[in-house]
Structures are given as C-alpha cells and as structure tokens.
C-alpha cells in the first residue's frame, strides 16, 4: 500500500474521530439547554407558588418554601454568589439558550461538512481499491 493511500486511510480515521467528538459536544450542549430550560420553568413556577423542592442529593428532595422568590442567588465563580431579580435571571438564561442553539447549529454544520469529506474520501478509496483489484487480476497468469 503506497504512502498516499495510507494517508487517506489515516485522514478517514481522523474525520470519524472528529465527528464523534462533535456529536459528544452536541450532547453536552443539549444537556446544558435542558438544564437551563428546567431552571427557567422552575423560576416561572415561583411566580405562582413559593413551594419548591430542595435537592438533598442522591435523588432525595425536601419540600420548602422560598422566602424571597423575587430574588435568585447565582454562582458566578468559585465562592462568588450574585443576587439578581428572578425576571432578569430568566432573561439571562433565555439568552444563554439562544446562544447555545446557535452553537449547536454551528456544530451540526461542522458535522455535515466533515461527513461530506468522509463520503468523498471513501469514494476515492473505493475507486483506488477497485483499480488495484483490476490490476491484480490482469497480472495473474492465465492457466490453460
């Protein structure tokens, strides 16, 4: 197998790895979007009821009542908390969802482009394999 053919097989492998990484990134983006949407839904719910479920860990919750549901405390860094109005946080989270949706679109476009390269490269490799087979068949001695 010549060096160019080896390089094409390696490129095909790299493209497949890139697609896998991009799909993993898409999955992470989807999880972030879902978490933000759940948070928005919970904050919207505070407008009609002060009762919340407070997570204790390992799937355990306790019912509690929000003392000041108009204010949300956000973690904005290591040991840094910021208090904001609930409506402002909802707007911020909605903007984050929009940005993540744009990022998701870019990642999907990159996956599509990479898949096109994979198809193109596979086609070239199939043509080369067919040509090698044909040459190999022509070189075999004929038996009578």
From Swiss-Prot:
Lineage: superkingdom: Archaea
Gene Ontology MF annotations: unfolded protein binding
Subcellular location: Cytoplasm
GO biological process, one term: protein folding
Presence of keyword Cytoplasm: yes
UniProt xrefs under InterPro entries: PFD_alpha_archaea, Prefoldin, Prefoldin_subunit_alpha
Any Pfam family matching the protein: Prefoldin
Disulfide bonds: none
Keywords: Chaperone, Cytoplasm
GO cellular component: cytoplasm; prefoldin complex
Principal subcellular localization: cytoplasm
Family, per entry: Belongs to the prefoldin subunit alpha family.
Function: Molecular chaperone capable of stabilizing a range of proteins. Seems to fulfill an ATP-independent, HSP70-like function in archaeal de novo protein folding.
Subunit and partners: Heterohexamer of two alpha and four beta subunits.
HAMAP family: PfdA (MF_00308)
NCBIfam families cross-referenced by the UniProt entry: prefoldin subunit alpha
Protein name: Prefoldin subunit alpha
Organism: Methanococcus maripaludis (strain DSM 14266 / JCM 13030 / NBRC 101832 / S2 / LL)
Lineage: Archaea, Methanobacteriati, Methanobacteriota, Methanomada group, Methanococci
């Amino acid at each position: 197998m010549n060096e160019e053919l080896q390089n094409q097989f390696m490129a095909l492998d790299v493209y497949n790895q890139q697609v896998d990484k991009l799909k993993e990134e898409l999955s992470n983006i989807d999880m972030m979007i879902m978490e933000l949407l759940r948070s928005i839904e919970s904050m919207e719910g505070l407008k009609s009821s002060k009762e919340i479920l407070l997570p204790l860990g390992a799937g355990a919750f306790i019912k509690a009542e929000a003392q000041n549901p108009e204010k949300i405390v956000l973690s904005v860094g290591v040991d840094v908390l910021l208090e904001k109005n609930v409506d402002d946080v909802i707007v911020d989270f909605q903007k984050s969802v929009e940005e993540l949706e744009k990022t998701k679109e870019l990642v999907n476009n990159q996956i599509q482009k990479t898949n096109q390269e994979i198809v193109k490269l596979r086609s070239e490799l199939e043509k080369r394999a067919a040509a090698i087979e044909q040459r190999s068949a022509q070189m075999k001695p004929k038996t009578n």
